[in-house]
């Protein structure tokens, strides 16, 4: 009798743990039916809803996100983004935040995947390793001493007075009023 009680005590939390860890959502159907899903063609990016049945619109960088709201568009962050939650709740008592890029070295939904690239830099959405060809191009095109012609070397020699005078003339033509640039 004791062994049956012990076995039951051990198996019930295991079964409940698997059910709770699978997903947290309210009013999910027992079986998914794609005909019940709304169209997500107008969305820039999509994610699975909390039930794991339908594609819904995803929130983008800088947009508001919520902990969990079943079947609603634009409340979960898209791939390569993570919801950074605020300490307060909204008027309905729901936790909310803002979508931000995954930190370097992570990627995927909620930034749960780890980048295994040699450089440690990967695409935040797909996890594909990124290489920067401009560094390789610059190293391959390093100047050599024999590439400059005699006229280029002659033009580069001198005391530099002509260059200073030319820069001084350009600065004199500028107005002294500070110009404000629009932010990007």
From Swiss-Prot:
Post-translational events: O-glycosylated; contains chondroitin sulfate and dermatan sulfate.
Localization: Secreted
GO BP: any one term: angiogenesis
UniProt entry tagged with the keyword Disulfide bond: yes
Signal peptide positions on this chain: 1-21
Residue ranges, annotated region (Disordered): 145-184
PROSITE patterns noted in UniProt: IGFBP_N_2 (PS51323)
Bridged cysteine pairs (disulfide): 28-51, 32-53, 37-54, 43-57, 65-83, 77-99
Domain IGFBP N-terminal: 24-102
Composition skew (Basic and acidic residues), residue ranges: 151-172
GO molecular function: hepatocyte growth factor receptor binding; integrin binding
Superkingdom in the source lineage: Eukaryota
SUPFAM superfamilies: Growth factor receptor domain
Xref: SMART domains: IB (SM00121)
PANTHER family cross-referenced by the UniProt entry: ENDOTHELIAL CELL-SPECIFIC MOLECULE 1, ENDOTHELIAL CELL-SPECIFIC MOLECULE 1 ESM-1
Protein name in UniProt: Endothelial cell-specific molecule 1
Organism: Rattus norvegicus
């Amino acid at each position: 009798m004791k062994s049956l009680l012990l076995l039951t005590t051990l198996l019930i939390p295991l079964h409940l743990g698997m059910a709770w860890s699978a997903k947290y959502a309210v009013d999910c159907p027992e079986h998914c039916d794609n005909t019940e899903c709304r169209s997500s063609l107008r969305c820039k990016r999509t994610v699975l809803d909390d039930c794991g049945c339908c594609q819904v619109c995803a929130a983008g960088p800088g947009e508001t996100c919520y902990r969990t709201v079943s079947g609603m568009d634009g409340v979960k962050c898209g791939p390569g983004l993570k919801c950074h939650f605020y300490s307060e709740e909204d008027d309905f008592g729901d936790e909310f935040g803002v979508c931000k890029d995954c930190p370097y070295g992570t990627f995927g939904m909620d930034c749960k995947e780890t980048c295994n690239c040699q450089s440690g830099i990967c695409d935040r959405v797909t996890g594909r390793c990124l290489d920067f060809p401009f560094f390789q191009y610059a190293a391959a095109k390093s100047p050599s001493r024999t590439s400059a012609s005699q006229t280029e070397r002659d033009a580069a020699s001198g005391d530099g007075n002509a260059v200073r005078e030319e820069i001084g003339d350009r600065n004199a033509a500028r107005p002294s009023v500070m110009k404000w640039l629009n932010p990007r």
